[in-house]
């Protein structure tokens, strides 16, 4: 039986951005609804009233960073209007909406579907970890978490990836665009790795989440790192600058690998006995469970 599509609310300011996001949300898995934009006849979107009116229908949100000012954020948190969220905008290293949000730059939207899955996984896992309850004033969050778990199944996106969306299963052009998007994310990660660790961590999360959910081969991850360092080396050489420090960026690759290893480790449900793992040893890799994202 096919899973029901997840309803993703798009809170964006321009038709071009809406079109770009819809392009990368497969309609076989997601149903996107546009809750903002000039065509809505609104000069300024009221995030609180908009989300409150659609609260029962929304499973996750894709929201533009500039819409999340301090006042809107405080009102959303105060009313318990929390959803799995992907914030589209710059990697600034700070929280725009809530602690479980994920970030994606506008030039990296080819990763959007994978990032939405990761955001839902993170939201559900954190709900279990922090023991949310009605006493916390977050009854609506509990209700959403239960609804997502019911619709996705007990394991949901915690432990099941979609093999049809693995890198090797994508059409050639889509695969190329996804790889180019990942390269841009990795570049952002490296550029801010030593100068702005918080922003770099957001880029790292974005890269690792997509790498995991798209089943990016480890060798391809290494290739992306080597290619990017090579580009930096060529640029430094043209400018007549020293390049010895580039070897320090091996730490970034080790960081990425450590996060990926942790995700695979967490992909094994804690209540599955070792005998169960042994009996499934010969399953195809596409059927292996997966995990929520990890942040440093």
Swiss-Prot record:
Keywords: Biological rhythms. Residues 162-270 form the KaiA C-terminal domain. Gene3D superfamilies: 3.40.50.2300, KaiA/RbsU domain. It comes from the Bacteria. SMART domains: KaiA (SM01247). Residues 153-161 are annotated as: Flexible linker. Residues 2-133 are annotated as: PsR domain, binds oxidized quinones. Residues 2-152 form the KaiA N-terminal domain. The N-terminal pseudoreceiver domain (PsR, approximately equal to KaiA N-terminal) binds oxidized quinones. The KaiA C-terminal domain mediates interaction with KaiC, homodimerization, and is responsible for the clock oscillation function. Key component of the KaiABC oscillator complex, which constitutes the main circadian regulator in cyanobacteria. Complex composition changes during the circadian cycle to control KaiC phosphorylation. KaiA stimulates KaiC autophosphorylation, while KaiB sequesters KaiA, leading to KaiC autodephosphorylation. KaiA binding to the KaiC CII domain during the subjective day yields KaiA(2-4):KaiC(6) complexes which stimulate KaiC autophosphorylation. Homodimer. The KaiABC complex composition changes during the circadian cycle to control KaiC phosphorylation. Complexes KaiC(6), KaiA(2-4):KaiC(6), KaiB(6):KaiC(6) and KaiC(6):KaiB(6):KaiA(12) are among the most important forms, many form cooperatively. KaiA and CikA bind to the same region of the KaiB(fs) form and therefore compete. This is Circadian clock oscillator protein KaiA.
């Amino acid at each position: 039986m096919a899973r029901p599509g997840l309803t993703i609310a798009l809170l964006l300011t321009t038709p071009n951005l809406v079109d770009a996001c819809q392009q990368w949300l497969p309609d076989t898995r997601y149903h996107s609804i546009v809750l903002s934009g000039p065509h809505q006849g609104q000069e300024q979107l009221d995030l609180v009233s908009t989300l409150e009116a659609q609260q029962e229908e929304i499973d996750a949100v894709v929201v533009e960073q500039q819409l999340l000012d301090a006042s809107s954020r405080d009102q959303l948190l105060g009313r318990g209007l929390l959803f799995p969220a992907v914030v589209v905008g710059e990697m600034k290293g700070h929280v725009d909406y809530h602690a479980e949000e994920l970030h994606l730059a506008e030039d990296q939207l080819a990763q959007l579907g994978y990032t939405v899955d990761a955001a839902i996984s993170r939201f559900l896992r954190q709900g279990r970890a922090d023991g949310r309850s009605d006493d916390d004033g977050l009854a609506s969050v509990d209700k959403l978490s239960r609804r997502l778990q019911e619709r996705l199944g007990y394991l949901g996106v915690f432990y099941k990836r979609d093999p049809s969306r693995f890198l090797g299963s994508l059409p050639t052009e889509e695969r190329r665009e996804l790889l180019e998007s990942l390269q841009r994310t990795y570049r952002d990660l490296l550029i801010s790795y030593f100068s702005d660790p918080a922003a770099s961590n957001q880029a790292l999360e974005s890269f690792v989440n997509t790498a995991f959910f798209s089943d990016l081969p480890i060798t391809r991850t290494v290739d992306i790192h080597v290619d990017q360092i090579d580009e930096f080396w060529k640029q430094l050489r043209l400018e007549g600058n020293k390049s010895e420090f580039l070897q320090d960026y091996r730490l970034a690759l080790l960081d990425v690998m450590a996060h990926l290893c942790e995700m695979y480790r967490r992909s094994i449900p804690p209540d599955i006995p070792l005998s169960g793992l042994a009996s499934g040893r010969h399953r195809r890799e596409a059927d292996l469970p997966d995990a929520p994202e990890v942040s440093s």
